[in-house]
Every structure is written in structure tokens, then in C-alpha cells.
Amino acid sequence: MNKDQTLSHTTGRVSFKELQQIIKMGLVQGNLIPAFAGAWLAIVMTNHSFLSSIPQILLMLVGSTLIMGGACALNNYYDQDIDRIMPSKQGRPTVNDRISDRNLLMLSFGMMLIGEACLFLLNIPSGVLGLIGIVGYVSYYSIWSKRHTTWNTVVGSFPGAVPPLIGWVAIDGSLSLAAVALFLVVFCWQPIHFYALAIKRSDEYALANIPMLPSVKGFKRTRVSMFIWLVLLLPLPFLLSNLGVTFVVIATLLNLGWLALGFTTFRKESNQTKWATQMFVYSLNYLVVFFALVVVVSLIKMI
């Protein structure tokens, strides 16, 4: 499809549902969970008042939402060529020409600029971490690694793990071991989560010539990599031992449960897609449960 044809079919206003697809609202919401947990933990561990910290939390969440949504919109702009090839992406407004390139870029950069303004209003570290997340996701992941190396998921995991750091520094202004621990949890979680998704869409990525690990190295190699990242998750709850024995035990059981799920089905010649789906669903629940546990346990300690 040439440019004239694309513009001629770009008609009407983008609906709210389509806007959510453009900025990948599901992905953004998932990242707001560790961002809030980072802020909450900073309040508890540095003895800040929750009520007096509410403005910072809200500004952090708004700023984080905007920079993540803007970066995702820019990713959708850059990925239009491969999205048109992949069957699962055919419903995207960028594929159906529901938004022009000009409006898409204006939306993307507008959101990122306003989001960065919000974060810099909080403090310089928040704004700098926001910039690191944007550059890492757009440049190093979307533009470079996604199309050139099977390490793309790991590269993308770094900017994807920045939200809890932003949450922490929004309150405290500097990083701590607890903040780094939250970063590492999200960093190690992402390859497992996205490899599971990539297994389910392996044929699509191969069709679009995207070097995702399952498409290039195969299913068995990808499962081994997922186990490595699962093992790396195991010691991380101990970095948050200040939250108490109860937290460490429950978080460790959460990790062991994920490992057991993967190992049990790994030993069987089960359907690859079914196995990947089980791991993917667990990953979604894991993220919510782990960070909810961080908030609840720290709340109990504060009371």
C-alpha cells in the first residue's frame, strides 16, 4: 500500500478503544502496578507520610502513564510494516489506517513530553529515569534489537523494569537496595512472560522475519531460557527481607510454584501452545500477586 492510498483510507476519529490499542493500555496498566508498589515501599521504608505523598504518587502515575503510552504509540508507528504481516496485529488502528502517521507521531511525542514534564516536576531523578525508559524502549528495543537479535526480549526488559525505580525516586529522590530489588524482579519476570507469548506466536514472528527466540532457536531452547530466568527470580525476595519472614516465604513459594508449573509440563511431551499459555497466565497473576504482597505486607508493618 502506497502513501496516497494510506492517507485516503485514514478517515474518521479514533475511538477511545482504538486509542487504548495505540498506546497499549494493557501494557501500561501492568507497568503501573510495580510503579505504585515502588512509591508505596519508599513511603513505608523512608517514613514518609502517605497523605502528604498522595500528590507525588498521582503525578508519578500520570507522568508514567503518559511516557509509557507515548513510547508504545511510537513503537506502533515504527512497527507498522511488520504488524501488517502478522495476523494477530490486524485489528490495530495503525494497521487499519484509522490514524495518520502525522497524528500518531503528534500523539506519541505529545504524551512523552507532557509525561516527562510531570516527572521532572517531581524531581530530576524521576525525569532522568523516565528518559532512560523512553530511549531504552524506543531506540534499543523497538528500532534496534527487536529486528536484529534474539536477545531483543532481554534488551527490552531493561526499560520495562524502570517503573518501580521511578515510583521509588518520586518519593525518596534516590535509589536504594529495595528499589533495585523491585527492578530486578520485573527485569527477570519479563523474559519468561514474553517468551511464553512468543512461543504462542512463533509462526507469526517468523513470517514477519522478527528474530524472537522461539522462532530462531526453537521451543526447547526457549524453555531452557525461561527456566534460567525463573531460577534467577528465586533469591530476589531475600533482597526485601526488611519486609519480614512472611513476605520472603510467600514470595518464595510464588516463585517455586511457577518453577514447578514449568518443570512438571516440561517433562511431558505436551502441546507447546498449551504449555506456553499456562506459563503466560501464571506470569500475569504473578506480577499482580507479588506487588500486591509488597503493598499489603508493608502496610501491615506500618500499622
UniProtKB/Swiss-Prot annotation:
Annotated metabolic or biological route of this protein: Porphyrin-containing compound metabolism; heme O biosynthesis; heme O from protoheme: step 1/1
Bilayer topology term: Multi-pass membrane protein
Transmembrane segments: 25-45, 54-74, 118-138, 166-186, 230-250, 280-300
Top-rank EC class of the record's enzyme: transferase
Catalysed conversion reaction: heme b + (2E,6E)-farnesyl diphosphate + H2O = Fe(II)-heme o + diphosphate
GO cellular component, one term: plasma membrane
InterPro entries, per database record: Protohaem_IX_farnesylTrfase (IPR006369), UbiA_prenyltransferase (IPR000537), UbiA_sf (IPR044878)
GO molecular function terms noted in the UniProt entry: protoheme IX farnesyltransferase activity
HAMAP family: CyoE_CtaB
Task performed by this protein: Converts heme B (protoheme IX) to heme O by substitution of the vinyl group on carbon 2 of heme B porphyrin ring with a hydroxyethyl farnesyl side group.
Quaternary structure, from the entry: Interacts with CtaA.
Protein name (database record): Protoheme IX farnesyltransferase
